[in-house]
C-alpha cells in the first residue's frame, strides 16, 4: 500500500461515551468537512446498531486493513478487534466489561501504524476509572501509548501532550497527576526533556524552522523572586537557561496570568506550563470545540479530540464531532506533510 493511500486508525474509545457517535457523525461529514479516510477499530455490529439507534444514515462495512480507503467513500470502514470481541454498551453507563475491547482497540491501532497499514493513530476518549478497575496501570492514554511505542528492552519514550488549536498551542509539563504532587515531580530535568521534545517535533512534524517557546511560572507572579515559592527560581529558570544555551528559543518562567491574552499569544508558538490545568483552561476557553490533543515524542503520529467521554450526553445525538474531525484532519496532515511545507500554527507576530 502506498504511504499516501494509508488510512488513519481510529480507536473505539469507551463505547458508553460519545466516541462511537462522533465517529459516525465525522464519516457523515466527510465530504463537507474534508475528513480524510479512516478505519475504526471495534465491533462492526455495535457501530451498526449505534447508527440505527441514533437514526443516522451511516452504512457500516467490516473491512480488512487494505480495504479501508476503497470502502470509505461509501461506508464507514470498521476493522474488527483482533480477538473478535463483541461490544455491548449502554450510553452513559460505563462498564468495565468493555475494558478489554477498549484497550485492544488502542493496541491494534498502534500495531497498524507500526506495520505500515495505517498512517497515524487517532484515539477516541476513554475513562481511566473504567480501565483501572480491571488492572490498567497507566495514568492515561498518553502514557499507555508511550509504553506501546517502547522497543523491547528499552524504556518508553517521554510522551508530551500538546493541545493544538488555530488560536493557541499548549504543553503541560506534568500531566495526569494530583496537584499536590507537582512540586516533587516538576524537576529541572523534566522541564528540559519536555522542551527539547517540543522543539524537535515542531521542527520535524510541523515544519517550523525556528520554534518559539515560552514557559509559564508555577506560582503566582512566577514566584516573585522566591517570595511566593521557590520552584520558579530554583527549577524553571535554570532549565530555561540550559535550554537557551542549547540554541532553543524559550523564555520564562513568565507569570501565567498574563501569558494567554491575544498580544502575548502572538509572541510564541507553544506555551509550556508546569501543571495540567494551567495549559488546558486557556486552550479550552479559546477553542473548546476545535482543540486537538497531539502526543509529541512518539515514533508515530497520534492525535485525539480535546474532550472526554461525555457520558452525560452519550446516546442523545447532540455530541459535536468538531474536535474529532480536527484531530483526524491534523493527524492526516502531520503524517503526510511534504518536507518543504509548514503546517498552520497559532498566528505569529
Curated annotation (Swiss-Prot):
Catalytic activity: 4-(phosphooxy)-L-threonine + NAD(+) = 3-amino-2-oxopropyl phosphate + CO2 + NADH
The protein's required cofactors: Zn(2+); Mg(2+); Co(2+)
EC number: 1.1.1.262
An annotated Gene Ontology molecular function: zinc ion binding
Pfam families reported for this sequence: PdxA (PF04166)
Enzyme class (EC, first level): oxidoreductase
Note describing how the cofactor binds: Binds 1 divalent metal cation per subunit. Can use ions such as Zn(2+), Mg(2+) or Co(2+).
Other known facts: The active site is located at the dimer interface.
Function: Catalyzes the NAD(P)-dependent oxidation of 4-(phosphooxy)-L-threonine (HTP) into 2-amino-3-oxo-4-(phosphooxy)butyric acid which spontaneously decarboxylates to form 3-amino-2-oxopropyl phosphate (AHAP).
Protein name: 4-hydroxythreonine-4-phosphate dehydrogenase
Species of origin: Methylorubrum extorquens (strain PA1)
